[in-house]
UniProtKB/Swiss-Prot annotation:
This is CD4+ T-cell-stimulating antigen. It comes from Listeria innocua serovar 6a (strain ATCC BAA-680 / CLIP 11262). The keyword Cell membrane applies. Gene3D superfamilies: 3.40.50.2300. GO terms for cellular component: plasma membrane. Keywords: Cell membrane, Lipoprotein, Membrane, Palmitate, Signal. It is a lipid-anchor. A lipid is attached at C23 (N-palmitoyl cysteine). It is found in: Cell membrane. Belongs to the BMP lipoprotein family. InterPro entries: BMP_lipoprotein, Peripla_BP_I, PnrA-like. It holds the Pfam family Bmp. A lipid is attached at C23 (S-diacylglycerol cysteine). Residues 1-22 form the signal peptide.
Amino acid sequence: MKKRTFALALSMIIASGVVLGACGSSSDDKKSGDDKSSKDFTVAMVTDTGGVDDRSFNQSAWEGLQKFGKANDMEKGTDGYNYLQSASEADYKTNLNTAVRSDYDLIYGIGYKLKDAIEEVSKQKPKNQFAIVDDTIDDRDNVVSIGFKDNDGSYLVGVVAGLTTKTNKVGFVGGVKGAVIDRFEAGFTAGVKAVNPNAQIDVQYANDFAKADKGQQIASSMYSSGVDVIFHAAGGTGNGVFAEAKNLKKKDPSRAVWVIGVDRDQWDEGKVTANDGKDYNVTLTSEIKRVDIAVDDLATRTKAGDFPGGTKIEYGLDKDAVGLSEHQDNISKDVLAKVEEYKQKIVDGDIKVPEKP
């Protein structure tokens, strides 16, 4: 009898231990799962040939990804947020496949030049999530297309250029001819002509986004012909436009030479100390494209489980994703008032800005 009672008690203790152990295991597993879900999200971007220090499009995208990473306590690297830099167009597909193998939850292709590579890789890897910035990929559930109304923002800097020029000659330097840069050229030209119908507009292309020397060569030719305001939509090539304007300002501080930057606030790029010992800035304004806002926004949505695959998200004046930069010291109050007037007309639909020259 005692043996039977002891055996029964022992079996109950063992059973209790199993139940408690199971409960403890379930709790620990749940906690482990929660930790994984909150920390395991990873994201990467593949640059075009400009790289993350191009002081333009890629840099703005990287700033947005860094902001997202820091806001979510993530570290730079394969376990958090990262970038893969492309030295040439041949690197696009290679870098995208590297990102896929690293199992990033979201992979950005920065710039329309990556469209073909993303189309191919996303088709081969339907379970991975991609985003193409500045172009459109249709009918692909694992790709989000991010676009900007560049023509609207370019129209506004065209208004600034048309009202600021003293020579009635302005210039546009494009990187590579295509649908995206067409919008910059078309918007800028329309804005200039809206406020200064008699202005002459010199349009030239460098056929590259990463050749500052070519940009400087074009700028030198334009300034020599009497152009006093140049808007560049040329990525790193535009650094050469700034270099030429600063050289001219340094030699002759009284000369009015201006550059309108692109994609991000390029105020710092225009700083120069002239031969008279005084500090100047040749940046008239910049047509900002808040790539950082778009990159941060989509990463945040995707991390929360809201990846809008198969759709295109457009950012424009209504979201302050395009427009003039914050540094406006070199623009008169009258010109800024005109900019606001035309901005409202565009937002209200009273002005339809062209997308093609």
